[in-house]
Design a protein with these regions (language model features):
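N-terminal core-binding DNA-recognition domain of tyrosine recombinases/integrases
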Residues: 13-26, 35-107
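Glycine-rich, histidine-containing beta strand-loop boundary motifs that form or position
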Residues: 32
Length: 107
């Protein structure tokens, strides 16, 4: 993966593959549902991870609420995005942005 241009969807795909390889099918299913929702939010356009911002995350949260997702679903999907984001930071694909998830519901 190109470190400078990795998309959220590519990173999700990598993490989902790792989860499946580890036999964590339920968790992989939740991550797949989260990336599907995020892709619908972006109208199936790739989202470079470097473009994640508090505004984008808040819009995603609002998108989910407008689709009548429960608060539990919203929180779960935001948590999966946060988890994938932190894995990308740990792998040095992107730089850490302090308080990126501060203004969204993440449980």
């Amino acid at each position: 993966m190109n470190r400078n241009e990795i998309t959220l969807q590519e990173m999700f795909s990598s993490v989902i593959g790792e989860l499946r390889e580890g036999g964590r099918w339920g968790t992989a299913h939740i991550y797949q549902s989260a990336v599907n929702a995020f892709s619908a939010f972006t109208k199936w356009q790739p989202m470079p991870m470097r473009k994640l911002s508090p505004t984008v995350l808040k819009r995603f949260e609002n998108f989910l609420r407008q689709r009548n997702c429960s608060w539990n679903t919203v929180s779960t999907y935001i948590k999966t995005v946060r988890s994938v984001y932190h894995r990308a930071v740990d792998r040095k694909y992107i730089r850490y942005v302090p308080r990126l998830f501060e203004h969204v519901d993440n449980g």
